[in-house]
Amino acid sequence: DHDRAQAMYERAIDADPTDADNLGNYAIFLKNVRHEYDQAKAMYERAIEANPNHANTLGNYSQLLFATGRDKTAIALVTRALPLAGTDEKPLVAECRFYLFAHSPEHRRESGENLRDLLAAGVTTGSWSFEPNLERLRREKDPRYDLVRDVADALSSGDTQTLESRGEWYAL
């Protein structure tokens, strides 16, 4: 029940208004479940204020910013998140690299190479959704949409067969 979940997030934040994990998780809920992007933005900003070095929050907030076309700010956040991600946070690194691959021409080649290495090492992001990013590329009629969608699918499933059949994946 989404209403009960929201009430629980709000109680947790009332109990500790500076807990970056609670603020960031509530922002994810607002973005992914409620589709309340302005409120999610406010929660992400509170979470970053509470802990400016919280790699997961920086990465998640960058998705919202990239999906809504605020690339310059998103690039700043995601490039901050990458060196902060721990060695055990390879899925987070893959997520951040995906956003740069999808939305930043300046970072595309390096991020594509990193994604190839991560996928070859068996790193996946599981059920994490890249749909907001794919929707933006669809809306903009980006010619790389099919490739980026295949990268998202490979990150979710670990199956790189479709991706490996794409010449442009290796031509990065």
Question: Can you annotate each of these PLM segments?
Answer:
Residues 5-9, 39-46, 72-84, 107-122, ...:
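Alpha-helical repeat scaffolds
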Residues 27-28, 62, 94-103, 132-136, ...:
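Conserved small-residue packing positions in alpha-helical repeats and bundles
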